[in-house]
Amino acid sequence: MLVSGIDDGYFPLKYKGRNGRTVMLSVVFKDYDIIDIDFDFIIVDGDDGTSVLNSLQTGDVCILDGLTFGGFNFVNPSELKSKYIIFYSSKPNIFKITRALDRHFNDERRDIIINVISNLTRVSTLRGDVYIYTNLDLKMAKNIIEEYQVFDRIPLPLKIAHEISSSLSTFLLSKKII
């Protein structure tokens, strides 16, 4: 089974409010080997996260670093083409998220994000409790997470996606590409 880690890159605060782009990146693993990396750009606080993720090369299952990318850009789980595990290493504060959404966004993202956060499932793994929202069987999702919890609670595909996307976006920013 091919498993992807999905994460976004760094962006400066001045990009908030749709004033810039950052990286959305997929790292595809077969067992513990990286077999593919793909990325594209998303608008910070935009609404293109779902379409960009659907255009990336991914594995059979995607482990997403949360539901929001590039600020409050987001993915709509019901529109994703692949199987997914939306992963949180700790429970998000729904009150803070709701307050931020109410202040800045009055569109579908509010309802989608609040619905997912409200319906996270706590899963006890060998490395501690995590919170997920998935379209997989819960036992299968737990097995995938535990298989890739090599060093800590965060699955290896997410750790690597984070490192590469942060480094890539910082590099592209330094070259004034984003």
Swiss-Prot record:
Domain of life: Archaea
Protein name: UPF0215 protein STK_03040
InterPro entries listed in its UniProt record: Endo_dU
Organism: Sulfurisphaera tokodaii (strain DSM 16993 / JCM 10545 / NBRC 100140 / 7) (Sulfolobus tokodaii)
Family: Belongs to the UPF0215 family.
Family annotation (PANTHER family): UPF0215 PROTEIN MJ1150
